[in-house]
């Protein structure tokens, strides 16, 4: 039996809807025992503060700066994560001393890889004090110091999961995470590992629904299912410079914008943006060394029926199969949080978190800042 560490992963993604929490036991390599998971939604008021913080973050020139609302926001965000951990431990009947480490992502408020600048607010030392558990945080910065894009970081976890795929799933396999921004991880039959952001995920759909006063997202894709794709608008998105050339890069929330309010009706806009999110995945996958045979989809976007219908139809044209991560034996809601738990253990072991083929860094790079209570 390998030396297993119990780790909690905490993820607050680009959708800014709340905190995902996951527990696993792992050696930081191929032994993974997935345990419980949960989520905690942010209040509407706190979500509004996060969005206001994105505006203040535009002024950041040095990643240690916290202009405007950001310093207090960082403190309050960290305390919310501490509450989430305490509640989770109580629900699971666990004590802090039974957890070896927390992997703490924080909230990305600025990501400019071309300037080697990425900022995730979240005070790891405060979280360690509040929970009584060691914390590893700030896992993207070291990758950038070595010429990487600082994203995506989940591929190391995907590679471990790929070793335990259900029988019958044909490779090459691509893991797709559809959060606010989508990313993909290609696991070749020869073990090749390639990853990059693939385009907008739920982000544009969510913003479109909010613009029209119809909530924070399109539940189940119901609005999109009643609309039609506007091909001219979709074409405009898919001709974005992000998709051109073979050089892949990571994305920030500001790289794509929604259509003007009067440009499309609500349903057609939602359907068009769902199509764009799906087509972006296939368009980005065209840069891979071999055509994928299976797409394993996680993240909130897999619950949008219109997006999944579009993705399935596009993949089938290329002879590929699309499967919800839940139906492949994984937890599609908790996968990113699980990854952060796994990466925290890898960090403690000095193992790489990123690779030249996943972020463009100059060598395999570990990372993260460890702090004790």
From Swiss-Prot:
Pathway linked to the protein: Amino-sugar metabolism; 1,6-anhydro-N-acetylmuramate degradation; Cell wall biogenesis; peptidoglycan recycling
Gene Ontology BP annotations: 1,6-anhydro-N-acetyl-beta-muramic acid catabolic process; amino sugar metabolic process; peptidoglycan turnover
E.C. code: 2.7.1.170
Positions annotated to bind ATP: 13-20
Catalytically driven reaction(s): 1,6-anhydro-N-acetyl-beta-muramate + ATP + H2O = N-acetyl-D-muramate 6-phosphate + ADP + H(+)
UniProt-listed InterPro entries: Anhydro_N_Ac-Mur_kinase (IPR005338), ATPase_NBD (IPR043129)
GO molecular function: ATP binding; kinase activity; phosphotransferase activity, alcohol group as acceptor
Origin superkingdom: Bacteria
EC class of the enzyme, as a word: transferase
Keyword terms: ATP-binding, Carbohydrate metabolism, Kinase, Nucleotide-binding, Transferase
Similarity section: Belongs to the anhydro-N-acetylmuramic acid kinase family.
PANTHER family cross-referenced by the UniProt entry: ANHYDRO-N-ACETYLMURAMIC ACID KINASE
Function statement: Catalyzes the specific phosphorylation of 1,6-anhydro-N-acetylmuramic acid (anhMurNAc) with the simultaneous cleavage of the 1,6-anhydro ring, generating MurNAc-6-P. Is required for the utilization of anhMurNAc either imported from the medium or derived from its own cell wall murein, and thus plays a role in cell wall recycling.
Name under which the protein is recorded: Anhydro-N-acetylmuramic acid kinase
Organism of derivation: Brucella canis (strain ATCC 23365 / NCTC 10854 / RM-666)
Gene name tied to this protein: anmK
